[in-house]
Design a protein with these regions (language model features):
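Phosphate-group recognition and catalysis centered on beta-loop-alpha active-site segments
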Residues: 26-301
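Positively charged n-region of N-terminal signal peptides that target proteins for export
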Residues: 4-12
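Predominantly soluble domains enriched in secretory-pathway, periplasmic, or organellar proteins
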Residues: 23
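Sec-dependent N-terminal signal peptides
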Residues: 11-20
Length: 301
């Protein structure tokens, strides 16, 4: 009887140790993704910003894509020039953003805008350098190390803007896949808030790794908007809680949190054992990850 109890205790301790190791492994291997490159310290979505993010040790890079009037993919968070980040070609502040529709501009025109020297109070540590919105192909050619990183490829798309500041989804999706096929990239996750562009990508290639972005609470309702199960969701970090994580784990859907910039918020996300954190300050979150430890969770991965 006592031998049987001893064996049971040994078995329990082995399982407990393995669970603890798996939990720590999951936390230490959680991806840290540079948001728009490394925008806490460098201008967003610029070649210089992507280089800095890689230098700081990110596991992945997040960038945003729009289209110019030549059908080329441009790295930009908006399909126009944001007044908070850019100066016009004459060096003047931008007042009416709608005047500068990237979808109606050539890349030569786009290059004339300076989106790197304007001070932004939200990012006081950001280094000021003259920088323009690059083409996707320029980033890949000028930052070759990026090919080995996981790419979080956010497609800027909004239904009211179809045909105005962007192509319609069917053409947009084929344009993206045709261009990306020219490059040898290690791993791409296509992301969007627009379900229609994700649907078109899924139709063209059901094997694509697709991430549905959402800033709303109630993830089950959001997922019902899609005709397929996405590989992952990208959620505003304040909407993530244990219940949300458990629902997504039961559905075998990955979870990425955006945009997490404070150590305490990073630790909270790590306690949920999610798949990755998207951050403006990669070094800060990488350091937080390296020092974090907690009790084992119930999550499978």
């Amino acid at each position: 009887f006592f031998m049987d109890q001893t064996n049971k205790m040994k078995y329990f301790l082995i399982i407990l140790c393995l669970s603890l190791q798996m939990s720590i492994f999951a936390q230490n291997t959680m991806m840290v993704v540079g948001h728009r490159g490394c925008r806490g310290v460098m201008p967003e979505n610029t070649i210089e910003g992507f280089r800095e993010a890689i230098k700081r040790g990110v596991d992945g890079i997040e960038w945003d894509v729009v289209v110019n009037n030549q059908g080329q993919l441009v790295i930009s968070h908006e399909p126009y020039f944001h007044k908070d980040f850019c100066f016009d070609p004459q060096g003047n502040p931008i007042e009416d953003e709608t005047r500068y529709n990237i979808y109606r501009m050539s890349q030569m025109q786009i290059k004339g805008f300076d989106c790197g020297t304007k001070f932004h109070k939200g990012f006081p540590e950001q280094q000021k350098i003259k920088a323009s919105k690059p083409l996707l192909k320029e980033v890949i050619n000028m930052v070759p190390e990026i090919r080995s990183k996981r790419i979080f490829f956010e497609i800027k798309s909004d239904e009211p803007e179809y045909g105005i500041s962007q192509p319609f989804p069917e053409y947009y999706a084929s344009l993206i896949l045709n261009e990306v096929s020219r490059y040898k990239l290690r791993s791409i996750r296509y992301m969007s808030f627009d379900k229609n562009i994700l649907e078109e990508l899924h139709k063209l290639d059901p094997t694509l790794n697709l991430v549905y972005l959402s800033e709303k609470k109630g993830i089950k309702k959001s997922l019902k908007e899609l005709s397929f199960k996405p590989n992952s969701v990208g959620l505003y970090y304040r909407t993530i809680n244990k219940r949300t994580v458990n629902i997504l784990r039961d559905l075998d859907i990955g979870i990425y949190a955006w945009t997490v910039n404070q150590i305490e918020d990073g630790h909270k996300m790590m306690s949920f054992a999610i798949d990755g954190i998207i951050t403006d300050y990669p070094r800060r979150i990488i350091e937080a990850r390296s020092t974090y430890s907690s009790k084992p969770k119930r999550f499978r991965h």
